[in-house]
């Protein structure tokens, strides 16, 4: 064994061994308990970033630990390879998206191997290959036949920069989630999957997910947005149709003083025929931003349509307005307005001088003051005829029942969730497998024409999709009739909604899934990824699992038992102000900093002498140029050091602050482990450990070893507090470094301790542990070694610490055998100088003894 720890020499050697031995390849084995550990698959952007490294290190630690427990562990990896960035990069680099993507995959695959992740590479998949997306296309045609897929023209969120449609979930604060451009409204024909048909199940089954973070479950609950209310029908004078509205507050119905409809509503369109002001307003609304955050804060505007609706209970005529806060695609495109008890309705009514009628009393029983704002709290009704005096619940039911009796109301459950629009007007995605025949009939692509292959050898102009620009591509024949293929492609969330299941049978050619393999491995035991996916990917992922279950492919209700959302990785961010006042962000690697005595940055400059402004720690990002390249760190310190720092610096679900001093600390620790093993093995062979022959000091050290095993096992397994597990191993290492190594049993005990330390560190730092295990002559490869088990007998304390008090004040702490009697403890306490001093010449009136903990002598 060489004296110095040289990761650059050992890591590549160990990685080659894993490759040649195919160490992490697994197959179904009914005789073993399975464990499926999955990290969210990466987009092949070109290079790994520290967020990836953190995500995949957490996964690898868990997978290696579970493997050492003797389980059959599946840890696969693949590539979420379709998507818009490839199109932009292709235009920029004068290439096509396919070669750019495949080059990136090859490069990033090497980076993953360099970090020592124990993946089953035989299951690697890329979602952009026809071998993968053919099954997604086939499944889509099956869903169409079941009535779960439909096409309709709808107002969509349109990103003018990316030239594509965004799902509601992809609009963040009125902007595109990807490029931050302001989103516009556009009418476009789109394909939808009926996720709303599964709304109740998606909501109710959240209760089964005991090991998912509450934050994620709450976000999904709110997104699904189930509400109970009443659908009410209004007659409209001089209009052929009725208007239907939905309300969750029928108790306020007697205070309804106007109705509001969307600009796109047929009633508004009809009224606009003779109303130029309304026609102009409708045009303006076409470009209104639709994100809910914007809807809440934008100025509320409207125009009176001139139509009057008749209140079904009072018979009063109330005006119908067109308003920019009502959307056609939400509910019925019409809402009832109760300005006395809804703030939005109040603001609108105040602005346009509409009637405000209070019908709910204030909490103290007085009439509410509506001079400044609406009273939105629930309460007792007044001003409501026969319903006066009823509380919220009684009024809800009484008014709902009355409307139902009259045939103008119906109790309804509503959802905020909308069907999933899966059409994208981009090229680099899986073609949607639908065709339109000459006679206008729309039908699924026949099975014998699947997969509909996306041509990869294309020229990108950055504006039009190559398959839309090439009229020949769309031409096909179905049942002898000419037909045109759909030129939209799937939202890339389609591919990432079922990849986890395809990993169980990546080579299967008879269908989407081999049920036998899928049901052996599924559900996923732990799924690791960022919380930013809470309502997009993680909702679609659950939905797809239920679709596959109902197609008979899987037999579980949910795709993953546990979800672990890792925290972000932060780094220092610096900039200097340029000549034109712009911020030039400087990488923390290039910042020369001065710190105060507490280690805080007080001054910084770059190599060119620019005075830098330090903005604190923020998420590693391209925009702030504060990303740290994992490859550079691995080349400098080794993969094991980077992995150890990642797991030690912070709990897995909290933000991690990148500090190179911390990385250096992790590296020093591994050097200490190496040195201790080197010094130990240099002394030659070791005798067998004779537990019965150990001295008290040796027993105490062995107790520490086994207590550490117990703690680390609990920290990694049950608590998943990996940082505290590492801290416990470090603490033990400090004790081992000071332990005597001269006697035969000293060395035998050291051998037992080091074999345990190396196995406990193995999930975190597998390369160094693989090597040290061999040097310590551990049995076989460490990859097949069992996790160390704490010896309960070794952990039993021989002695215990008893606090001795005189009149309630601590006078001594004594060590006594655990089985010492009260008499023996009193005798031992009396030998302490301070205790003897306070007992001299006084009478002990009372003795309070808590066995093994406390002796209190009351004197007087």
Swiss-Prot record:
Q: Which Pfam family, just one, is annotated for this protein?
A: Anticodon_1
Which reaction equations make up its catalytic activity? Answer: tRNA(Leu) + L-leucine + ATP = L-leucyl-tRNA(Leu) + AMP + diphosphate
Biological-process GO terms, alphabetical: leucyl-tRNA aminoacylation
User: What does the entry list as the binding residues for ATP?
Assistant: 622
This enzyme's EC code(s): 6.1.1.4
Disulphide bridges in this chain? none
> GO: which molecular function terms?
aminoacyl-tRNA deacylase activity; ATP binding; leucine-tRNA ligase activity
InterPro entries, sorted: aa-tRNA-synth_I_CS, aa-tRNA-synth_Ia, Leu-tRNA-ligase, Leu_tRNA-synth_edit, M/V/L/I-tRNA-synth_anticd-bd, Methionyl/Leucyl_tRNA_Synth, Rossmann-like_a/b/a_fold, tRNAsynth_Ia_anticodon-bd
Establish whether keyword Ligase is in the entry: yes
* Main location (coarse class): cytoplasm
Q: Which segment of this protein is annotated as the motif 'HIGH' region?
A: 42-52
- Spell out the GO cellular component terms annotated for this protein, sorted alphabetically and separated by semicolons: cytosol
What stretch of residues is annotated with the motif 'KMSKS' region? 619-623
- Has the keyword Nucleotide-binding been applied to this entry? yes
Record's subcellular location: Cytoplasm
Record's family? Belongs to the class-I aminoacyl-tRNA synthetase family.
Instruction: Give the PANTHER family listed for this entry.
Output: LEUCINE--TRNA LIGASE, MITOCHONDRIAL, LEUCYL-TRNA SYNTHETASE
Q: What is this protein called?
A: Leucine--tRNA ligase
């Amino acid at each position: 064994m060489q004296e110095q720890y040289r990761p650059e020499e050992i890591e590549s050697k160990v990685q080659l061994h894993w490759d040649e031995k195919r160490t992490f390849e697994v197959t179904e084995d009914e005789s073993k308990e399975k464990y499926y550990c999955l990290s969210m698959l990466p987009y092949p952007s070109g290079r790994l970033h520290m967020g990836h490294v953190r995500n995949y290190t957490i996964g690898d630690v868990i997978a290696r630990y579970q493997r050492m427990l003797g389980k059959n562990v599946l840890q696969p990896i693949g590539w979420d390879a379709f998507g818009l960035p490839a199109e932009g990069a292709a235009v920029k680099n004068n290439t096509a998206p396919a070669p750019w993507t495949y080059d990136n995959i090859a490069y990033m695959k090497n980076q993953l191997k360099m970090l020592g992740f124990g993946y089953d590479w035989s299951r690697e998949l890329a979602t952009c290959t026809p071998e993968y997306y053919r099954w997604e296309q086939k499944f889509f045609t099956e869903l169409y036949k079941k009535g779960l897929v439909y096409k309709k023209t709808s107002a969509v969120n349109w990103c003018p920069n990316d030239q594509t449609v965004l799902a509601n979930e992809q609009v963040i604060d009125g902007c595109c989630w990807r490029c931050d451009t302001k989103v516009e409204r556009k009418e476009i024909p789109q394909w939808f999957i009926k996720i709303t048909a599964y709304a109740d199940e998606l909501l109710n089954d959240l209760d089964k997910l005991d090991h998912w973070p509450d934050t994620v479950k709450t976000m999904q609950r709110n997104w699904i947005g189930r509400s109970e209310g009443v659908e009410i029908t209004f007659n409209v004078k001089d209009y052929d149709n009725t208007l239907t509205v939905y309300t969750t507050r029928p108790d306020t119905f007697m205070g309804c003083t106007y109705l509001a409809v969307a600009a796109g509503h047929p009633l508004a369109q009809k009224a606009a025929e003779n109303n130029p002001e309304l026609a102009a307003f409708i045009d303006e609304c076409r470009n209104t931003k639709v994100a809910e955050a914007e809807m809440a804060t934008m100025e509320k505007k409207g125009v009176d349509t001139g139509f009057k609706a008749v209140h079904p209970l009072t018979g009063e005529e109330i005006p119908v307005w067109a308003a920019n806060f009502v959307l056609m695609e939400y509910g019925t495109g019409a809402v009832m307005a109760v300005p006395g008890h809804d703030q939005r309705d109040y603001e609108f009514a105040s602005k346009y001088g509409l009637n405000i009628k209070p019908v709910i009393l204030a909490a103290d029983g007085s009439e509410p003051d509506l001079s400044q704002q609406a009273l939105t709290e629930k309460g007792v009704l007044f001003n409501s005829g026969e319903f006066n005096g009823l509380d919220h619940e009684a009024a809800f039911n009484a008014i709902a029942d009355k409307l139902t009796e009259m045939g103008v109301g119906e109790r309804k459950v509503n959802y905020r969730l909308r069907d999933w629009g899966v059409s994208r007007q981009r090229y680099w995605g899986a073609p949607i497998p639908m065709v339109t025949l000459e006679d206008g009939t729309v039908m699924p692509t026949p099975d014998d024409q699947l997969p509909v292959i996306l041509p990869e050898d294309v020229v990108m102009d950055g504006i039009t999709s190559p398959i839309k620009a090439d009229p020949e591509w769309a031409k096909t024949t179905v049942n002898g009739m000419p037909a045109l293929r759909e030129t939209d492609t799937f939202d890339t969330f389609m591919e990432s909604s079922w990849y986890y299941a395809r990993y169980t049978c990546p080579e299967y050619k008879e269908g989407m899934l081999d049920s036998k393999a899928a049901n052996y491995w599924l559900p996923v035991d732990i799924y690791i990824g960022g919380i930013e996916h809470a309502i997009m990917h993680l909702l679609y992922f659950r939905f797809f699992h239920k679709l596959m279950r109902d197609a008979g492919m899987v037999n579980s209700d949910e795709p993953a038992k546990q979800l672990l959302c890792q925290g972000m990785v932060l780094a220092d961010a610096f900039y200097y102000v340029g000549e034109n006042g712009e911020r030039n962000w400087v990488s923390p690697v290039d910042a020369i900093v001065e710190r105060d005595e507490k280690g805080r940055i007080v001054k910084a400059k770059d190599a060119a002498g620019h005075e830098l402004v330090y903005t604190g720690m923020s998420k590693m990002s391209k925009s702030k140029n504060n990303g740290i390249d994992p490859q550079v760190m691995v080349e400098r310190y080794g993969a094991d050091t980077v992995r150890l720092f990642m797991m030690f610096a912070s709990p897995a679900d909290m933000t991690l602050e990148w500090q190179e001093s911390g990385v250096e600390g992790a590296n020093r620790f591994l050097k200490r482990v190496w040195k201790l093993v080197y010094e130990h093995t240099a002394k030659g062979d070791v005798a067998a450990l004779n537990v019965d022959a150990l001295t008290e000091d040796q027993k105490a050290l062995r107790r520490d070893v086994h207590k550490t095993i117990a703690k680390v096992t609990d920290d990694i397994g049950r608590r998943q507090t990996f940082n505290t597990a590492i801290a416990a191993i470090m603490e033990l290492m400090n004790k081992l470094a000071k332990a005597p190594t001269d006697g035969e049993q000293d060395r035998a005990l050291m051998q037992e301790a080091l074999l345990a330390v190396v196995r406990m560190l193995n999930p975190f730092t597998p390369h160094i542990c693989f090597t040290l295990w061999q040097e310590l002559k551990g049995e076989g490869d460490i990859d097949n070694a069992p996790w160390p088990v704490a010896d309960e007998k070794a952990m039993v304390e021989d002695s215990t610490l008893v606090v001795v008090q005189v009149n309630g004040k601590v006078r001594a702490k004594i060590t006594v055998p655990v089985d010492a009697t009260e008499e023996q403890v009193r005798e031992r306490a009396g030998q302490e100088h301070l205790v003897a001093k306070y007992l001299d010449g006084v009478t002990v009136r009372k003795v309070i003894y808590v066995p093994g903990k406390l002796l209190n002598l009351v004197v007087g």
